């Protein structure tokens, strides 16, 4: 995901009318073929001192204070985020409980952090941006059934639970699936279902979805995701842009007539979208 950068002018909101849309109508001609994408980690793990992955239980560290989250929210608001529903949801989720204790002091900074297995937790501004875009779907801001591709440590799923009535989150790495389950257990969110599986195929049993959000990017949007998007639904995902030679945020809307319309937004940096599952756990 996008790396830490020097302060810049506000990025929120960025209405679709303010962009130069690339409109495409998709024709279902079979499964989209993904080509290998060079790894694009949000932040090299070597740049950050870390210890063996374990939940950040930080009694006495002071990070349980609401003040830390409040300051994070104020920074997002100052940067231009105007979706108060997203900001309120993020203010209620303790991000430090989803990262390793060695990194907890950085939990409320606007930076991505490693969570092991070559994956990262998204920086708060990226989470706010993508969720804000998700809520601007043609069917309205109220989200019903949402599919998250790439559970990771579970942080974004926890935020989504405060914005949607049903959240399905799928993770291909068993170790991260288990970690997310452990992280989310104390929150007891009845509307959340965690799935261990190949996110490349979406999650057909509970489709269609009002919204689909992905935490990894490939060369094309998988056909399964498009097929599982409800009428008036919206998909937000990173995708490789051949013209720019980098990843961009892509928004795909299923219009009332069933057609699919795509818009491309700013440059981002996400880990690559991969197929299959892995139950590998380090010794």
From Swiss-Prot:
Catalysed reactions listed for this entry: [protein]-L-isoaspartate + S-adenosyl-L-methionine = [protein]-L-isoaspartate alpha-methyl ester + S-adenosyl-L-homocysteine
EC top class named in words: transferase
Similarity comment: family membership: Belongs to the methyltransferase superfamily. L-isoaspartyl/D-aspartyl protein methyltransferase family.
Molecular function terms, GO-annotated: protein-L-isoaspartate (D-aspartate) O-methyltransferase activity
Active site residues per record: 122
One Gene Ontology term, aspect cellular component: cytoplasm
GO biological process, one term: methylation
Location(s), subcellular: Cytoplasm
Biological role stated in the UniProt entry: Catalyzes the methyl esterification of L-isoaspartyl residues in peptides and proteins that result from spontaneous decomposition of normal L-aspartyl and L-asparaginyl residues. It plays a role in the repair and/or degradation of damaged proteins.
NCBIfam families, per the entry: pimt, PRK00312.1
Protein name: Protein-L-isoaspartate O-methyltransferase
Pfam families: PCMT
Native species: Leptothrix cholodnii (strain ATCC 51168 / LMG 8142 / SP-6) (Leptothrix discophora (strain SP-6))
EC number of the protein: 2.1.1.77
Gene3D superfamilies in the cross-refs: Vaccinia Virus protein VP39 (3.40.50.150)
Keywords from the UniProt entry: Cytoplasm, Methyltransferase, S-adenosyl-L-methionine, Transferase
């Amino acid at each position: 995901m996008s790396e830490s950068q020097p302060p810049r002018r506000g990025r929120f909101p960025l209405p679709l009318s303010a962009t130069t849309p690339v409109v495409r109508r998709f024709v279902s001609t079979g499964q989209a073929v993904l080509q290998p994408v060079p790894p694009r980690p949000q932040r090299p793990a070597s740049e950050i001192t870390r210890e063996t992955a374990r939940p950040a239980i930080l009694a006495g560290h002071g990070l349980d204070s609401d003040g830390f989250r409040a300051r994070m929210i104020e920074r997002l608001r100052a940067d231009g985020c105007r979706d108060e529903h997203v900001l309120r949801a993020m203010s209620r989720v303790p991000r430090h409980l989803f990262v390793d204790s060695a990194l907890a002091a950085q939990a409320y900074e606007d930076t991505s952090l490693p969570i092991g297995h070559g994956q990262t937790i998204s920086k708060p501004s990226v989470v706010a941006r993508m969720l804000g875009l998700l809520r601007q779907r043609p069917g309205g801001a109220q989200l019903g059934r949402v599919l998250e591709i790439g559970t990771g440590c579970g942080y974004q799923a926890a935020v989504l639970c405060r914005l949607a009535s049903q959240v399905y989150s799928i993770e291909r790495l068993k170790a991260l699936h288990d970690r997310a389950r452990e992280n989310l257990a104390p929150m007891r969110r009845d509307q959340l279902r965690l799935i261990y599986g190949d996110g490349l195929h979406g999650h057909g049993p509970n489709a269609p979805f009002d919204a689909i959000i992905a935490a990894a990017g490939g060369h094309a949007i998988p056909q399964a995701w498009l097929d599982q998007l409800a009428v008036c639904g919206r998909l937000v995902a990173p995708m490789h842009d051949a013209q720019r030679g980098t990843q961009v945020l892509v928004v795909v809307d299923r219009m009332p007539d069933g057609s699919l319309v795509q818009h491309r937004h700013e440059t981002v940096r996400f880990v690559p979208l991969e197929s299959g599952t892995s139950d590998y756990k380090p010794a």
